[in-house]
């Protein structure tokens, strides 16, 4: 079993990410959708990304984020128990799920359990 505590080099791009992870749940903005997530991501990526892969990511992001949350990641929650979301980057709607300012660390610790 991999132990987080035994890891000597804990710096990585994922570890240092503070903003959050995007998924179009529509918990705060009911108009949000995987289609809008696709558009925001594809356009903000200067249309460099493979549209088919960006579409898959936008469609599957909610189920992946829910799965990580169910494994014990410490995402912020609304009073109704749903994931809280905030604006981040150039996205049209609040879709960034976060764990304070330590989202990357929270996700990595969860995945390494």
Regions found by a protein language model. Give the residues of each.
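Conserved N-terminal/central alpha/beta ligand/cofactor-binding core
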Residues: 4-113
